Swiss-Prot record:
Organism this protein belongs to: Pyrococcus horikoshii (strain ATCC 700860 / DSM 12428 / JCM 9974 / NBRC 100139 / OT-3)
Active site (record annotation): 433
Gene that encodes the chain: pfkC
Known EC number: 2.7.1.146
Protein's GO biological process: fructose metabolic process; glycolytic process
Keywords noted in UniProt: Cytoplasm, Glycolysis, Kinase, Magnesium, Metal-binding, Transferase
Name of this protein: ADP-specific phosphofructokinase
Length: 450
């Protein structure tokens, strides 16, 4: 069922995920480099961003004591050097929604995958799969180069460092012995101004129409990396205007647009992204928490609170229908741990059976990637077919039938399917992006048949 004849463009966010597996010796050496009282004092202060090594050590120790996953932004670009000297990375893999989606689709061997990120240093370019193309302008003409050959010297690099820790590890902080109560991970995510400008660069922008002629669909993501203000006087509004121009260029070439939404903590920035981008696209991918975030911005606070608190399928369906109507795009795709959902209007040309098949392709592709760690060829998809649907499948179906009896859904097509869930996944990062990419790909395929 893989639509190998389709071509996809993906932008804007790609980064390196550098994995560090923490052991007792590494943790102890880190702590010993500082006065234990200073570490304790900094833990009390609870730094919300990392500016210097002591900030990192304090937040890491705090996370290890609790045994709960955490993420803290790194705001000092000079700290890159300290991290690279201090740690040996177990693995460097491609991260960022646009990067993950490009590599997944390239693994399926579809006709063409064009990836675009405004920053392409060599270290990042080398993590993309063979077959992924990058647009460049040479002698005034648009060309598509293998992405590994298109890197630019001096481009800024975004590295998210993921520190994995195991339950039971012990270390000392002064006189105190600490045992880690649970396994988990501590993420240090790069948040420098130099890598937060989400845009199509000036050399490529005039050629977006030409790129649009080469593809059937485009998947945009990464808006959550924007800042409200920049040191040169630009702001989020400037970059969102440019992003909207990109979308309109593709739409004029009849390219279907999917946006993979992501949580944005800053409420004002979230509102700007929702109101400036989502009404102009065809398809939006979100999870339950993001349904609530969008509803809150649209003024449906009570329903948003219900979704955050109770997590009921019925509320998510109602919220999804409201989002679809308020923002007036074509189809909403919701991915959660236990179910996937499409909500679209009744006049959508796809039947409910075709919509269900599209979602099934998405969850099967994600199950294959979770099982194998990567999609290296079209046959890898079949591995996902062997993964059973999750243990709550019957419960999901029952709740969906109840929701149908309570909600007025006559004007909509709503399809809910259970997910395939891998018990011991090799990989968990980016599975929502994988589902969205697979579902959007097959959605395009069914649309073409109509």
């Amino acid at each position: 069922m893989i639509p190998e004849h389709l071509s996809i463009y993906t932008a804007y966010n790609a980064n390196i995920d550098a994995i560090v597996k923490l052991n007792q010796e590494t943790i102890q050496n880190l702590i010993n480099a500082f006065d234990p009282d200073e570490v304790k004092r900094r833990i009390e202060e609870y730094p919300r961003e990392i500016n210097e090594p002591i900030d990192f050590v304090a937040r890491l120790v705090h996370t290890l004591k609790l045994g709960k996953p955490a993420a803290v932004p790194l705001v000092n670009e000079k700290m890159n050097e300290w991290f690279d000297k201090t740690f040996r990375y177990e693995e460097e893999r491609l991260g960022g929604q646009a990067g993950i989606i490009a590599n997944t689709l390239a693994g399926l061997k579809i006709r063409k995958v064009i990836a675009y990120t405004p920053f392409l240093p060599k270290r990042l370019a080398e993590l993309f799969k063979k077959g992924v193309l990058y647009p460049v302008v040479e002698n005034g003409e648009l060309q598509f180069k293998p992405i590994q050959e298109a890197y630019r010297e001096g481009d800024p690099l975004k590295i998210n460092r993921i520190f994995e820790f195991r339950k039971g590890l012990k270390f000392k902080l002064g006189d105190e012995t600490i045992e880690i109560p649970n396994s988990g991970r501590f993420i240090v995510s790069a948040r420098f101004e130099s890598i937060s400008r989400i845009e199509t660069r000036e050399d490529i922008k005039p050629f977006l129409g030409e790129i649009g002629k080469e593809v059937d669909g485009a998947i945009f993501s990464g808006y959550q990396g924007l800042r409200t203000k920049y040191s040169d006087g630009k702001d989020a509004n400037y970059y969102l205007r440019r992003a909207k121009e990109d979308i309109i260029e593709f739409k004029e070439k009849d390219v279907k647009i999917h946006v993979e939404f992501a949580s944005v903590q800053d409420r004002k920035l979230r509102k700007k992204i929702i109101t400036n981008i989502l009404p102009f696209v065809d398809s939006v991918g979100i999870d339950e928490a993001e349904i609530a975030q969008i509803l809150s911005v649209l003024g449906y606070r009570e329903l948003a609170d219900r979704i955050f608190t109770y997590n009921r399928l019925e509320d998510s369906i109602l919220g999804g229908m409201i989002i679809l109507d308020e923002l007036n795009f074509e189809i909403l795709q919701v991915h959660t741990t236990y179910y996937l959902m499409y909500i679209t209007h009744r006049d959508n040309p796809l039947s409910e059976e075709e919509l269900a098949k599209s979602l099934e392709f998405g969850t099967t592709l994600a199950a294959a990637r979770a099982s194998l760690g990567d999609i290296r060829g079209p046959d890898d998809y079949k591995v996902g077919l062997k993964v059973p649907f999750n243990e709550r499948s019957e419960y999901v179906k029952l709740r969906f039938e109840e929701a149908k009896s309570r909600l007025r859904m006559r004007e909509y097509k709503v399809v809910v399917i259970p997910t395939r869930l891998v018990q011991n996944p090799v990989l968990t990062v980016g599975l929502g992006d994988t589902i969205s990419a697979g579902a959007f790909l097959t959605y395009l395929e069914f649309l073409k048949r109509h």
